[in-house]
């Protein structure tokens, strides 16, 4: 047999043998043909498998390249986002630094203003010596002397004496006085000041107060005739009027209530007088005649004094006219917005009520159709009547215009006749006959008066 090295050589040998057999024998063998076909199909299938493997390898390479591109794009996007975040963080840090710097500057300015105001107050305040013996004696006088705390705010001179010269808080002080007068009756049975309460208080008590003290002690430093008066500049009436017009009662009351307890003054009126009448009755019986004579003058002794929490420019150096006005304006704006919001809500509620109050009408019923027909007929009739009226009015206007033209023509004719008559009479006046001239003059005068 033949030694075959490759399938191709085997196939060629098979074909040659087949041809030889065909030449020798007229009938071919079926087995040899099937073997050749099998070998050919095996060869083609092997080649197809190789091609499929190559295609799969190419597809895998393409997929790997696409994955690499996706990963590179994601990395690029991540780097861009990181850079944007870094820029934002840097901007936020700069904003925080600028805000901190501005806050520090504002705090420094506020401290400087406060220090300057306190320095000015220390320079402008007058030193008034206190009569301690007289103050101690005042605590055990009659019932009127113990009412100084309630009279400090409610008295007309108490607030006017402590107002600063510029009148920066006059409106707020007036509102405070009104509020305390209204709350005094409600709190009359709850609060009371004891006998041991001092007749003077700290801070802004002796800033602008006027003392009319008549001491019973001969060795006291303040005599009966000594009184310290402080002259103040008059408040500008225009400025006061402007404050009174701009400040409403509700806004000022809300401003006082919302000012973090700056105006927690003594809000009782004549409380200590009512609570200490029984205690002072025994003390008045044991006092000397000189003390009894000075009771009337000691009643209004410290009425001009103010407490530490009452509006005073010494105890509140940070409160200025501009800040008070700004707060009041802000509160008034808030009230206006609240009122507008309430009105809008009310209108909306009314509209909804009207919508719900309308009856549901079925448009498919005969009654609805009859009503619609009646309404249409009424509308048509009213339109026809309006057209007729408009035509009548137009005709009337035309007739009136014609009458006006005729009257104007008559008027022009009459004026022409009058001018002719005047010319004739003027010529006749120059006539030699005096009687004719006299008649013409009288006629002209009567015509002028008639005209």
UniProtKB/Swiss-Prot annotation:
**Regions of compositional bias (Low complexity) in chain numbering:** 218-228, 268-298, 334-350
Where does the source fall among the domains of life? Answer: Eukaryota
Residues annotated as region Leucine-zipper? 400-407
Region span, Basic motif: 369-398
User: Disulfide bonds, which pairs?
Assistant: none
Primary localization? nucleus
Entry GO MF terms:
DNA-binding transcription factor activity, RNA polymerase II-specific; RNA polymerase II cis-regulatory region sequence-specific DNA binding
Q: Which Gene3D superfamilies match?
A: 1.20.5.170
Q: List residues of the bZIP domain.
A: 365-428
Keyword annotations for this protein? Activator, DNA-binding, Nucleus, Transcription, Transcription regulation
Task: State whether keyword Nucleus applies.
Answer: yes
Q: Name one GO cellular component term.
A: nucleus
Q: Which PANTHER family match?
A: CCAAT/ENHANCER BINDING PROTEIN, CCAAT_ENHANCER-BINDING PROTEIN GAMMA
Describe the subunit structure.
Binds DNA as a dimer and can form stable heterodimers.
Q: What is this protein called?
A: CCAAT/enhancer-binding protein
Biological source species: Drosophila virilis
């Amino acid at each position: 047999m033949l030694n075959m090295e490759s399938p191709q050589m085997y196939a060629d040998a098979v074909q040659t043998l087949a041809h030889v057999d065909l030449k020798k024998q007229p009938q071919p063998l079926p087995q040899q043909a099937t073997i050749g076909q099998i070998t050919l199909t095996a060869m083609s299938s092997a080649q197809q498998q190789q091609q499929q493997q190559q295609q799969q390898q190419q597809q895998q390479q393409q997929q790997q390249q696409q994955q690499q591109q996706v990963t590179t794009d994601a990395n690029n996007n991540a780097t861009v986002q990181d850079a944007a975040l870094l820029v934002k963080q840097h901007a936020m840090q700069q904003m925080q630094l600028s805000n901190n710097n501005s806050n520090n500057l504002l705090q420094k300015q506020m401290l400087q203003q406060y220090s300057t105001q306190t320095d000015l107050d220390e320079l402008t305040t007058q030193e008034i010596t206190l009569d301690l013996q007289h103050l101690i004696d005042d605590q055990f006088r009659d019932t009127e002397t113990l009412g100084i705390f309630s009279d400090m705010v409610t008295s007309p001179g108490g607030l006017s004496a402590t107002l600063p010269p510029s009148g920066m808080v006059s409106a707020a002080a007036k509102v405070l006085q009104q509020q305390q007068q209204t709350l005094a009756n409600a709190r009359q049975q709850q609060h009371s000041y004891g006998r041991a309460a001092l007749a003077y208080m700290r801070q802004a008590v002796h800033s602008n107060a006027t003392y009319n003290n008549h001491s019973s002690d001969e060795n006291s430093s303040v005599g009966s005739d000594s009184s310290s008066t402080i002259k103040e500049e008059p408040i500008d009436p225009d400025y006061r009027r402007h404050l009174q017009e701009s400040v409403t009662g509700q806004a000022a009351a809300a401003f006082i209530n919302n000012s973090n307890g700056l105006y927690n003054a003594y809000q009782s009126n004549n409380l200590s007088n009512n609570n200490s009448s029984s205690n002072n009755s025994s003390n008045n019986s044991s006092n000397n005649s000189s003390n009894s004579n000075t009771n009337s003058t000691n009643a209004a002794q410290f009425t001009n004094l103010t407490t530490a929490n009452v509006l005073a420019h010494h105890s509140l150096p940070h409160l200025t006219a501009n800040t008070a006005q700004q707060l009041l304006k802000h509160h008034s704006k808030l009230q206006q917005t609240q009122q507008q919001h309430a009105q809008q809500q009310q209108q909306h509620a009314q509209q909804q009520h009207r919508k719900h109050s309308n009856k549901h009408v079925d448009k498919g019923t005969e009654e609805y159709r009859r009503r619609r027909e009646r309404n249409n007929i009424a509308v048509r009739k009213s339109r026809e009547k309006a057209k007729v009226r408009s035509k009548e009015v137009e005709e009337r206007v035309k007739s009136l215009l014609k009458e006006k033209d005729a009257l104007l023509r008559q008027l022009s004719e009459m004026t022409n006749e009058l001018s002719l008559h005047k010319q004739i009479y003027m010529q006749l006046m120059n006539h030699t006959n005096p009687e004719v001239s006299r008649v013409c003059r009288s006629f002209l005068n009567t015509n002028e008066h008639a005209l």
